């Protein structure tokens, strides 16, 4: 037998088998020649689920979506050259949103590098600081030590991806021709296992008892506190955060991505309209928390970030299992390296029930006043983009997922996704906040989260049209709501809007595309709605039938801006009147 083929088959077979043994059982593959042996072995292994995606950029985000939804590592495989470079945006997003991806790139062997060989470029540390770890795998050799090395390296890389903060890792595989493995080899998947096998087990960072006692003592004398829950908080944070709020009397300012706004838990202390009422000047000047406890990533709301930044006299406690200083407001006074659950559990156990005071009632009262005013937009007949969110939530069934694209959809979700007793998971790509790869990420998530509704703007939709292929290839179920304002709607809310002379050409960027033909090309259904009743009917139909469903609602950017400003102005008047009444 050819010694090269034997080495190739056993070495890469050990690698693939070790992936599945460590529960990395999903791989998104883009076709290519140099990655042939790994792709074939993955397809052959009974423990591996393989998903084809032709476009590497979309493939990267598709894998990201699967990993976000499954909350475990997913592998990506491509050939050498620019194919690997197309993963870059998804890798950046995975790194900053702390999602474990196992990025596998095939490469030319060392003798074909820097000599002008076709489809060869420098892939060493290709993703730079956006991966937690990089390793250049050894050329396959036919001996037990190398098979064991393949497994041990796999263990180390997966452990790195799972270690807090979670994130992507990159393995580069130089491979010589011929590239076809021999599946007739005996014990193809067993080489390198040895008598003992490694286990990658992720634990929780715990709270030192001395710190807990000290913190409990301090908090017991602080009546005015806030609990802020952002993206990527622990999946059980709702239960623990609400218990902590009940003990302390601190309101919970819940970002929509914290998934605390919806569900069957007690939401008495949950504040959902802070993005609107924290714009009020009088409120910002008079409401001064003594302590702010923050879990997860920084919230979407700019108004909340600015409010946090102004609280220079407060104690700011950032709870982060990795100990990283995610503090763009630059106000953190304490960073606690513990899991959200460990932190809450420790305080709940030792914290006495605080005396009821006016602090939490003030927040609850203003929150309800604000929500009452915001709900007036549900009477608007016009195509107001904020109502897109409330009407979707109205028809979503229990256990559904709402995926919000970046730019305006996530901001409208922040403003208009009110508390609900239905379990509705909210997802988004808030690592680097780009508008690329949104369709693909949502489609990846839809493999696990069904039904799933994606809300996306027309430019973001255009940006990832190639991603729709996954819906056709893998027969996925998804409803995509395209809010078509023919351009970049968010720029109307920014200072650039005042530069009328060049606004449309540089920022408004209308592209005037009809997406119906594209959707049909990918085997999906398309409907352009003309009223809110039809909108709700089409969204509901999409969540109860199989396949790709695209619902387009056309809006006017200038009108949408005016309606947002009108609502904000009205809420500010209501809030100011309420605050002035309380001060009398």
Curated annotation (Swiss-Prot):
E.C. designation(s): 2.2.1.9
Keywords carried by this UniProt record: Magnesium, Manganese, Menaquinone biosynthesis, Metal-binding, Thiamine pyrophosphate, Transferase
Matching Gene3D superfamilies: 3.40.50.970, TPP-binding domain
GO BP terms in the entry: menaquinone biosynthetic process
Keyword Protein biosynthesis set for record: no
Pathway assignment: Quinol/quinone metabolism; 1,4-dihydroxy-2-naphthoate biosynthesis; 1,4-dihydroxy-2-naphthoate from chorismate: step 2/7; Quinol/quinone metabolism; menaquinone biosynthesis
InterPro entries, A to Z: DHS-like_NAD/FAD-binding_dom, MenaQ_synth_MenD, MenD_middle, THDP-binding, Thiamin_PyroP_enz_TPP-bd_dom, TPP_enzyme_TPP-bd
Pfam (any one): TPP_enzyme_M_2
Cofactor dependence: Mg(2+); Mn(2+); thiamine diphosphate
SUPFAM superfamilies: DHS-like NAD/FAD-binding domain (SSF52467), Thiamin diphosphate-binding fold (THDP-binding) (SSF52518)
Cofactor binding note of this UniProt entry: Binds 1 thiamine pyrophosphate per subunit.
Catalyses which reaction(s): isochorismate + 2-oxoglutarate + H(+) = 5-enolpyruvoyl-6-hydroxy-2-succinyl-cyclohex-3-ene-1-carboxylate + CO2
GO molecular function annotation: 2-succinyl-5-enolpyruvyl-6-hydroxy-3-cyclohexene-1-carboxylic-acid synthase activity; magnesium ion binding; manganese ion binding; thiamine pyrophosphate binding
Function: Catalyzes the thiamine diphosphate-dependent decarboxylation of 2-oxoglutarate and the subsequent addition of the resulting succinic semialdehyde-thiamine pyrophosphate anion to isochorismate to yield 2-succinyl-5-enolpyruvyl-6-hydroxy-3-cyclohexene-1-carboxylate (SEPHCHC).
The protein's assembly and partners: Homodimer.
Family membership: Belongs to the TPP enzyme family. MenD subfamily.
Protein name, per record: 2-succinyl-5-enolpyruvyl-6-hydroxy-3-cyclohexene-1-carboxylate synthase
